[in-house]
A protein has these predicted regions:
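Generic enzyme active-site microenvironment
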Residues: 13
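Extreme N-terminal starter segment of soluble prokaryotic enzymes
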Residues: 6-10
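Short, Lys/Arg-enriched N-terminal segments with co-localized hydrophobic residues
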Residues: 1-5
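Active-site nucleophile/metal-coordination loop of metallo-enzymes that catalyze phosphate/sulfate
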Residues: 16-164
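Active-site pocket-lining segments that scaffold enzyme catalytic pockets across diverse folds
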Residues: 133-218
Length: 219
């Protein structure tokens, strides 16, 4: 086995598909989490022969999957501080995060917002911790009227900008996010996320053109 030369590998990342709580779960309110197992239980079991062959049933208890497999299976926990996507992706590439990305449960500081608004020639409304679908329903009408972009965050280190495609096209939205990314580095914010949506009042829908602007890894 060890004499075999691996010419290439396929690294598949299924973001947020957890297989059980990590040792630091209590620090993030994640006690008892197990996305894969809980989803399988909710739907009454899953039929995933390829996942089963890879060994997913060996990693955690998944209704519908067995322990028989043909692959080499392992289950790892992060050494990094943090539980967001960027931290995990960096560690997959060998970079350990020793300083957790900054979160802003009470909104972002005005000096950061002012810098972005000035350079990007835009205005923001919102600046709250919120669900993405709920905030476009709550502020969507105001956004359509004023053309001010919707700014919000979550429990992770994210600076999210939502805009209706008729108010701010993708090219403009991405450009604004690039400006935001530059200033968010100074605040140790992991990701700036473009959140375009479409539709009418009472029937807004986020599109598939989301784009994440991550902090460049150090080193």
């Amino acid at each position: 086995f060890w004499n075999y030369i691996m010419k290439r590998c396929f690294l598949v990342v299924i973001d947020s598909l957890g297989v059980g709580e990590a040792p630091d779960a209590k620090e993030y309110g994640d006690i008892g989490t197990n996305t894969l197992s809980n989803v399988a239980k909710y739907v009454g079991g899953v039929d995933l022969p390829n996942f089963n062959n890879l060994g997913f049933g060996k990693i955690t208890n998944v209704e519908g999957l067995g322990e028989k497999h043909s692959g080499t299976v392992g289950r790892l926990s992060e050494l990094s501080i943090g539980n967001d996507s960027t931290t995990g992706h960096w560690e997959l590439a060998g970079l350990i995060t020793e300083k957790e990305f900054q979160t802003f449960p009470n909104g972002f500081p005005s000096e950061l917002i002012n810098k972005i608004e000035l350079e990007a020639n835009c205005k923001f409304i919102g600046n709250v911790h919120a669900s993405g679908t709920e905030i476009i329903e709550n502020l969507g009408e105001q956004h359509l009227t004023t053309k001010e972009l919707i700014l919000y965050t979550s429990g992770h280190s994210v600076f999210q900008i939502a805009a209706h495609e008729d108010i701010c096209n993708l090219k403009e939205l991405y450009k604004i996010c690039e400006v935001a990314r530059k200033y968010c580095d100074d605040y140790n914010i992991g990701r700036v996320i473009a959140r375009p949506f479409k539709g009418s009042i009472g029937d807004f829908k986020r599109t598939y053109d989301r784009k994440d602007f991550g902090m460049n890894p150090p080193g």
